C-alpha cells in the first residue's frame, strides 16, 4: 500500500486571497534610475480603496495574480514586482487618481516595444475593480532606452539627405485616397511635386487593392519623382506605404522601393504592429531609406480622457520602435489636439532631453540619450490660412501635410502646391524678420497674395473654412 500523505501549509506559503496593497502598495519606495515608471489615470469602482486599485494595477501588470501561489517562493518578488509608490487625486474629478507605478528593468526584453506594452497594458485594463484606466505617461530609463535602435535616421540626417534647411517640409496626401489607377495616381504625385512640395504621400489605407496593386503604384510614383526632380532641381519623395498582410510582404515592398532609388517609405505602425515596425525600421537604417509613420487607429486608443493610452505614450513607443516622421495632429485642423498637450508630445518626439512639465501633460523627465529625433507631421484639414499658425506652433523641424489643401485648389494640383510653398516661405521670411505670426499672420498671407495668383485663389476658396469644436482630451 502506498503510504498516506498529509498536506501541510509550509512556513513560507499560506494559500488564499489577500489584498494586493499588502504586497504591491509601497509608498516608501525610492525610485531607481533604471526603473520604468508609469503614470495611470485610475478610476476605482465605488467602494474600492484607491490604494488597493493602484496596487492591483502594479500587480497585474507585473508579477501578481488574484490569489497567492506557492511558486512565489521560488523567486524574489522584491526584485521583480511592480510597485505603486504614489497616489495623487485628480483635481476637479471625483474618485479619480493618478497612480504612479515603478517596474524593475529586468521585467522587460531588451529592445522590444512589444514586450514592454504587453506587460504594462496587456491585461490590467480589463480588471473589474477598475471603472476606467488610462496610461498617461511612461518614463523610459536611460538603461532601457539604450537597448533600442530608434528612428532609422532622425531629423538632422533627413535634412542632409534632402538638402533642405531653414523651413518646414511640405507634403500632400493624394486624394481620393482609394479608387485611382496607378497611372492616374502617379500623375497626381507628379503635379504636386513639380508645383513645389517636398513630399507626397500614400494614405494609410492604400496598400495593394484590386484597383491599384502595390508594384504598379511604386513604378508610376518613382517615374513621377524622377521627372519632378529633373524639372525642379530639388530632391523629392513620396511616402510609399509598405504596410502589408505579412512582415515578409512588407519587407519585399521596402526592398522594391530601395531598388527604385526612392528616398522614403511608409508604415502604419499601430495596425501593422510594433514588431513589424521595428523590423522595418532596422531595414530602413541598413538600406538608407527614411521611414514615415502613420498613426492609423490611434484615436481608438487615445481619444477618451479616462480610458486607454494617451498619444504621448504612443509617440514614445514609436521613437523606440523606429520612425523618422510621425503624424502628431495640427492643433488648428480637423483632428483632435490641444495646443499645450500637442507641443508636449512633439517635444518628446524631437528633443533629446525633456523636463517634467505637468502643464503640458509631461509627468516624467525623459532622457532619450542616443535615440535620434522624430519629425512631427501636421496633417488633417489644414490649408493656406493655417500656415502662419503652423509655422509658429511647430517651427522648422516639422512636415506640414496639405491633402485637400493642395488637391482642392481650383486650378489644379500644381497651383495648389505652389500656393502652399509660397505661403510657407512668406511666413518663414516674416518670422525671420521678427514679425509675430500669431498676430500678423493674416497680413503676411494677404501681402503674398498680391504677387502670387495661385495663393490668392487658394485663400479665396478656403477663407471661411474653420474646424472649431471643443477638445475632448484636455489636461
From Swiss-Prot:
An annotated GO cellular component: chloroplast
Subcellular location as annotated: Plastid, Chloroplast
Keywords linked to the UniProt accession: Acetylation, Calvin cycle, Carbon dioxide fixation, Chloroplast, Disulfide bond, Lyase, Magnesium, Metal-binding, Methylation, Monooxygenase, Oxidoreductase, Photorespiration, Photosynthesis, Plastid
UniProt family annotation: Belongs to the RuBisCO large chain family. Type I subfamily.
Active site: 175, 294
Protein name: Ribulose bisphosphate carboxylase large chain
Note: The basic functional RuBisCO is composed of a large chain homodimer in a 'head-to-tail' conformation. In form I RuBisCO this homodimer is arranged in a barrel-like tetramer with the small subunits forming a tetrameric 'cap' on each end of the 'barrel'.
Record-listed N6,N6,N6-trimethyllysine modification sites: 14
A GO BP annotation: photorespiration
Site (Transition state stabilizer): 334
UniProt keyword Plastid, yes or no: yes
Residue(s) carrying N6-carboxylysine: 201
InterPro entries: RuBisCO, RuBisCo_large_chain_AS, RuBisCO_lsu_C, RuBisCO_lsu_C_sf, RuBisCO_lsu_fd_N, RuBisCO_lsu_N_sf, RuBisCO_lsuI
Propeptide segments, given as residue ranges: 1-2
Disulfide bond keyword on record: yes
Changes after translation: The disulfide bond which can form in the large chain dimeric partners within the hexadecamer appears to be associated with oxidative stress and protein turnover.
A single MF term (Gene Ontology): monooxygenase activity
Lineage of source species: Eukaryota, Viridiplantae, Chlorophyta, Ulvophyceae, TCBD clade
Cofactor(s) named in the record: Mg(2+)
Enzyme class name: lyase
Alphabetical list of Gene3D superfamilies matching this protein: Ribulose bisphosphate carboxylase, large subunit, C-terminal domain, RuBisCO large subunit, N-terminal domain
Encoding gene (name): rbcL
